[in-house]
Amino acid sequence: MVRPYTRKDYIRKIPASKIVQYDMGNLSGEFPLEVTLAVKEHTHLSHNSLEAARIAANRYLQRTTGKLGYRLKIRTYPHHIVRENPMATGAGADRVQSGMRGAFGKAVSSEALVRANQKIITAYVQVKDFEKAKVALNRAAMKLPVTCKLVIDKGHDLVQF
């Protein structure tokens, strides 16, 4: 795993994170069941993929359980700043660019560095909506560039998994 590049004091222009919300649904409700999406291996998750996973899970849960029937929480934050040294291609590119001289690059994106078995997204639902939460988190897992697993954090005695 790489060392995170997070010192924002040294970076002039930081790209904004596309993740709009970290807590969605009924924030004040009590839910007996917590189903969590966890990654199986070390990886980098871009803010774009985290936002796509959030949208997929939130939209499905909102459609199937209603606006007050769930709570969804994003549990990682993209702190790591990704830099890129843009290389010119085509005719005459060697005159325009300086190659690897001054190759530190510009900040282009942000990523979350996640470890194996780290929890990414948690859905809080009623027992009757357990299958819907599983489908929603599986849809979110399809948007991530890593294999994921479902973990029941709370209420595992209430459902068969």
Curated annotation (Swiss-Prot):
Q: Which UniProt keywords apply?
A: Ribonucleoprotein, Ribosomal protein
Entries under NCBIfam families matching the protein? PRK04199.1-4, uL16_euk_arch
What family does this chain come from, according to its entry?
Belongs to the universal ribosomal protein uL16 family.
Identification of the protein by name: Large ribosomal subunit protein uL16
Can you name the source organism?
Methanosphaera stadtmanae (strain ATCC 43021 / DSM 3091 / JCM 11832 / MCB-3)
By its UniProt entry, which HAMAP family does this protein fall under?
A: Ribosomal_uL16_arch (MF_00448)
Q: Please, which domain of life does this record's source organism belong to?
A: Archaea
A Gene Ontology cellular component where this protein is annotated is: ribosome
InterPro entries registered for this protein in UniProt: Ribosomal_uL16, Ribosomal_uL16_arc, Ribosomal_uL16_CS_euk_arc, Ribosomal_uL16_dom, Ribosomal_uL16_euk_arch, Ribosomal_uL16_sf
Q: Entry's PANTHER family? A: 60S RIBOSOMAL PROTEIN L10 (PTHR11726)
The GO terms describing molecular function are:
structural constituent of ribosome
GO BP field: translation
Q: Which Pfam families match?
A: Ribosomal_L16
PROSITE patterns from the entry? RIBOSOMAL_L10E
